[in-house]
């Protein structure tokens, strides 16, 4: 399988040896290239997911979705982006301007920060620390501040109610989310994201297979908790149109609203990417111990495996959104604290016992 670190090493060698640049300028140029790459990937993935969700929604509602702008409506998203870019950005009367302007950037920082930890190919990861999973959960928590400050700074009672709902929901479901990730850490013995993927290379080595029933349950709980963490249906109580207009970003227009819209879909990608990385092997191919089959699977590039698994998980989450009705706030919190939280603790105990007794792999 192709190792992307060859490309990064070649770029570094080009800057330092061929062009003769010093350490400062080499690192600066590399950081600029990485930043441009992140923003480009951010925009393209968000556009692809918006188009995908419109088509998935249309499929479940027995219609065609956008078909006018471009073939099969593929340019509809670009038209919407253009419209959003030229809209005026204004602040409502008596709003807290500092909080109002800071909030969208906090949401973007949280989504881009967690996105940077995803390894999409062997040797292709922007950030890779030995406590990677811990940092992912820590950085994602910044999004709670962005949601709450947006509602509080807008000087709108509906936005405040929405922000409080969203903050309570996101903080609650972080517990189950973290416990499911700890179960994976117990099984692999590392919190480094690249190390977790490397532990799943080999025949029948994906955690959802190697971890048996506890890993399968952890994967399912992670999907439910991740869906709630991203404020996606049926957990989209913070944006309940029939109750709160548009939720915590009611008073935002132009790219202020656009930041929240983009962050929602990138958070969906991050949740799906973490699920595929931790439980489904990430860029690791499916190997079953048959030489011919394994060699064929190894020919498929790692980024295709990663994006294929990630978009498959996203399709499942979109399916859930457009199938189930919205839950009430008491039902959402009851689901977490009475069912998912105890189940996550039981899964962690079972996983620990399986690893201690050698019943894994």
Show the residue positions of the predicted features:
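Selective transmembrane helix interface/packing segments
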Residues: 2-361
């Amino acid at each position: 399988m192709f190792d992307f670190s060859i490309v990064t090493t070649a770029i570094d060698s080009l800057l330092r040896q061929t062009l003769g640049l010093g350490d400062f300028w080499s690192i600066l140029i590399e950081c600029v290239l990485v930043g441009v790459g992140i923003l480009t990937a951010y925009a393209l993935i968000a556009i692809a997911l918006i188009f995908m969700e419109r088509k998935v929604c249309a499929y479940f509602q027995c219609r065609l979705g956008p078909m006018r702008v471009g073939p099969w409506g593929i340019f509809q998203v670009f038209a919407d982006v253009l419209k959003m870019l030229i809209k005026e950005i204004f602040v409502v009367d008596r709003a807290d301007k500092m909080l109002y302007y800071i909030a969208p950037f906090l949401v973007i920082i949280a989504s881009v920060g967690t996105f940077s930890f995803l390894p999409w190919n062997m040797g292709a990861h922007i950030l890779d620390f030995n406590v990677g999973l811990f940092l992912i959960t820590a950085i994602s928590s910044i999004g709670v501040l962005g949601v709450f400050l947006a509602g509080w700074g807008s000087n709108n009672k509906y936005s405040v109610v929405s922000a409080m709902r969203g903050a309570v929901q996101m903080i609650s479901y972080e517990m189950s989310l973290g416990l499911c990730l700890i179960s994976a850490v117990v099984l692999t013995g590392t919190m480094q994201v690249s190390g977790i993927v490397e532990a799943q290379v080999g025949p029948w080595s994906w955690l959802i297979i190697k971890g048996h029933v506890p890993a399968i349950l952890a994967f399912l709980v992670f999907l439910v908790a991740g869906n709630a963490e991203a404020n996606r249906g049926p957990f989209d109580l913070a944006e309940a149109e029939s109750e709160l207009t548009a939720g915590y970003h009611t008073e935002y227009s132009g790219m202020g609203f656009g930041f929240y819209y983009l962050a929602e879909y990138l958070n969906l990608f991050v949740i799906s990417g973490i699920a595929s990385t931790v439980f489904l092997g990430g860029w690791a191919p499916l190997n079953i111990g048959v030489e011919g089959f394994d060699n064929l699977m190894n020919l498929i590039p790692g980024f295709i495996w990663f994006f294929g698994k990630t978009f498959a998980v996203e399709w499942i989450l979109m399916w859930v959104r457009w199938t189930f009705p919205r839950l009430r706030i008491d039902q959402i919190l009851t689901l977490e604290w009475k069912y998912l939280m105890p189940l996550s603790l039981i899964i962690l105990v079972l996983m620990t016992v399986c690893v201690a007794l050698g019943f894994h792999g």
